[in-house]
Amino acid sequence: MTSRNYLLLTPGPLTTSRTVKEAMLFDSCTWDDDYNIGVVEQIRQQLTALATASEGYTSVLLQGSGSYAVEAVLGSALGPQDKVLIVSNGAYGARMVEMAGLMGIAHHAYDCGEVARPDVQAIDAILNADPTISHIAMVHSETTTGMLNPIDEVGALAHRYGKTYIVDAMSSFGGIPMDIAALHIDYLISSANKCIQGVPGFAFVIAREQKLAACKGHSRSLSLDLYAQWRCMEDNHGKWRFTSPTHTVLAFAQALKELAKEGGVAARHQRYQQNQRSLVAGMRALGFNTLLDDELHSPIITAFYSPEDPQYRFSEFYRRLKEQGFVIYPGKVSQSDCFRIGNIGEVYAADITALLTAIRTAMYWTK
């Protein structure tokens, strides 16, 4: 381990500002009103406001990574007679399928392949053929490949068929403008350490209050009972059922202030988009090819094919980049040899320029 700080070019955890880190220097009592009412309740209100201006939505914070919240939603939102259609085109859609299977939740997995955009007509046909489906769940920004999925079109289907709509917006909420009411989303799931630019430690769910209120008694887990967590926060003014990750929460409160200072989600989206476009242009100039076509890319993370040169090893490429202060991500695509570069967090145009220079230096197989 080294004391040197790297620029994390990953989809989260990501590079955070010094002020977000410094917010964690304060110790809070989990029973204190200054913390629960002054911090937690403020966060809940701000998250709901970021998601939509429409009435009837609420938010719940939950200890753990984003996957904990995904499992909490699946395990709480679906009753014993319900069935979920899971749209999957990557590791995180597949993870939802695995969760549903382990919890004994009836589900239909529509897997369209890792590099294919979900076919909305195929989803329509599935819904038309199976009236027992009560819920639809999908990932928005699938970081396996960097693909941005059509949550608007699927949301329109969910609304037309009267289905409850669950969206894993882990790597998009706070970085891509959206109105969850207009998108017909009933449950949106995200995490502290993604586009809001906080640190790991908790996830959150922004939900239609009427839907959440109907979840009582559904949960397959004590600690992942979304309804019970929500009622505790509602009835006790921000109190968590079990130990709150206080330092992470304080960091997140600071991160929300910095999001507002940047100009909100629209301004952050613009920065991320420019980062991603500059990255792709620079990588192509160096001879790298993207896994996806441009129209499929999210502004969050990009997958690049590994060089075909027999000398190339990702581990050596990674080491050489890390020596220069940059950390990238290995590939997660099962059918292609790739690596991934994220461009969210405290990453700006100058950082992308510096990264491209470092990559040129690290391309030992071209020497």
UniProtKB/Swiss-Prot annotation:
One Gene Ontology biological process: organic phosphonate catabolic process
Domain of life: Bacteria
Keyword Transferase in annotation: yes
Positions of modified residues (N6-(pyridoxal phosphate)lysine): K194
Pfam families for this protein: Aminotran_5
Cofactor binding comment, as recorded: Thr-243 of one partner binds the pyridoxal phosphate moiety of the other.
Alphabetical list of InterPro entries matching this protein: Aminotrans_V_dom (IPR000192), NH2EtPonate_pyrv_transaminase (IPR012703), PyrdxlP-dep_Trfase (IPR015424), PyrdxlP-dep_Trfase_major (IPR015421), PyrdxlP-dep_Trfase_small (IPR015422), SP_NH2Trfase/AEP_transaminase (IPR024169)
Catalytic class of the enzyme: transferase
GO molecular function list: 2-aminoethylphosphonate-pyruvate transaminase activity
Cofactor dependency: pyridoxal 5'-phosphate
Catalysis performed (reactions): (2-aminoethyl)phosphonate + pyruvate = phosphonoacetaldehyde + L-alanine
Subunit record text: Homodimer.
Role: Involved in phosphonate degradation.
UniProt name for this protein: 2-aminoethylphosphonate--pyruvate transaminase
Species per Swiss-Prot/TrEMBL record: Salmonella typhimurium (strain LT2 / SGSC1412 / ATCC 700720)
